[in-house]
Amino acid sequence: MEARQPNATGSARRPMATPSELHPDLAELAFLLGDWSGTGEGLWPPGETFDYAEEVTFEYVGDPFVLYSERSWSLDDGSPIHFENGFQRPAGPGVVELVLAHPIGITEVAVGTVRDGVIELSSTAVSLTPTASPVTALRRRIEGRGDELSFELHMAMEGVELRWHVGSKLTRA
């Protein structure tokens, strides 16, 4: 058994698969694979802005889905801001599903499109624990161009309509 290498978040993972080893259903998501890092900015209601650093890993694990892990922290003081883990799954040509768990007490299921290195997803379900942040909807856009990846997240909460929440620019490690 081969030794696993740590990824950007410190967990051990298999060496990156080559395009010929990928499950054929993942061809449209292959641009995501790898470890990414960079910075972003965000906006919390009622208008407080913040800057953050972010590390993201998209990993092929042998089945027709991509394992996803994200973590971010404040550029001001290094304190953790957010984590999320889950999977991206192809659901047919040009269609992708996202299943995520967030430590703020929510799970997210989203469906969307993938085309020419752009993924657009909208939540179809957001489930909350009794003490969760009152998130009601999420919309994501991920765009990959070579070794650059950009993220945008729009979020709605109880009493707050869907609006831009965070955006980041990442480079492949």
In which residue ranges do the predicted regions lie?
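N-terminal amphipathic/basic-hydrophobic helices that include classical n-h-c signal peptides
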Residues: 1-15
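Hydrophobic small-molecule pocket/channel-lining residues, especially in calycin-type beta-barrels
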Residues: 13-173
